Amino acid sequence: MGRYENAAALAALVRDTEVHRDCYADAEVFDLEMKHLFANTWVYVGHASQVPKVGDTYATSVGDQPVFMVRHADGSVRVLHNRCPHKGVRLVQEGCAHAGKFIRCPYHAWTFRTDGSLLAVPLKQGYDPQCFGATEAAAGLAPVGEARVYRDFVFCRLNPVGIGFEEFFGDSLSTLDNMVDRSPEGRLEVAGGVLRYMHRCNWKMLVDNQTDTCHPMVAHESSAGTAVRVWNEAPEGTPKPMAVELFAPFVNPYAFFEGMGIRVWANGHGHTGVSDSLHAAYSPVPGYWDSMVAAYGEQRAHAILGDVRHNTVYFPNIMVKGPVQTLRLFKPLAVDRTLVESWTFRLVGAPDLLLERTLMYNRLINAPTSVVGHDDLEVYERAQQGLASRARDWLNLARLYEPGEQERTVAVTNGTNELQMRNQMRAWVRFMTADMPEGVAA
């Protein structure tokens, strides 16, 4: 047994206002995250619009486990482990594909129905029925512990026993509701492909940064700050480019971010942008308001579009931006390596200019060739390098800490409070140890 393979040792890594560097830099801790954390939590798999037809598949990973979702014959979306029960071959290639009426292994042509059940085995007369029926392979493809489709967002929990979907997410699902409701038809579709790039840092650094509101005006001074300075020199009457609208809020002063507010929920979820947001001052899109009023009525349309949450963290590893219809998935590959996927969505029934803004935002902020995102990348990688130092063991999360705050399951507070980071790490302890005999209720 390793030094951290017990609940007490893991819990000792997280204090009220500090986190031990091993949470970000120790390979054993990372392996335990793959075994426990990503198995005990509800993790994002994909979006139902990626598998629109029966037999469509989308292959990805949850933690270190290869999985795929597939549209079954009854129209439901199933999530299965991406492993043939015969010789262990990965069945579905990464990304979107179409399997047809059944899934066929490329090695020995064993075939499976789209619910994972075994359909056919070549030369089956070579297997004794009683003997074969007692093997694991006879059960077909292994499903994940549980899967749930919510407003077309597909999540799964790998472990067969654990916290329920509604209990895990609670009121945090209101962010997904708001993003979907921004469509006059109440539907989203994945659009514009996916942008991926590698980060040589621990995955939790990216999650932490989503609600770190004390860094934008510093880290993004050379990128967003330059864009603002150039715009300020433009001749009077020059139409304001969409790119400037997207860049400018990143260099707002501390007072703006303090007033923006932050909300946390139980189990590690939370968001910035309660009373104001980086996305609150975009130019109106012609025709959009009228289509929303026609769909929802004026009062409801005001409520939907007036909720401009900035970054919503869904623990453990996604961030959603409802007002610009983007989702970032932080896929852990190693203790010091993370693949970031940036996804964009179309508001079905809304003007195309909204999708244009979404795609531009993703390119400017979240792409491998982005401007703002590379400021963050540089800092993440410097942080990972700095953690090699043994001069200090603890990272500080003490900003605006209040004794006893962990007793509150929902809180709204100053936008520069590090409460959400502390909230995440308390959830980290809980779900890292949930399936251990001496599990810790953090």
Predicted regions: what they are:
Residues C23-G63:
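Glycine/alanine-rich phosphate-binding loops at beta-alpha junctions
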Residues F38-W42, V89, H215:
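Generic structural signal for secondary-structure transition and capping sites
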Residues R71, S76, G145-A442:
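C-terminal catalytic domain of Rieske-type non-heme iron oxygenases
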Residues N6-C23:
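Short, contiguous pre-domain boundary segments
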Residues M1-A9, E438-A442:
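Basic/polar N-terminal segments that are highly enriched at the extreme N-terminus
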Residues A39-P52, G126-C131, V308-Y314:
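Short Pro/Gly-enriched beta-strand edge/turn motifs at strand-loop
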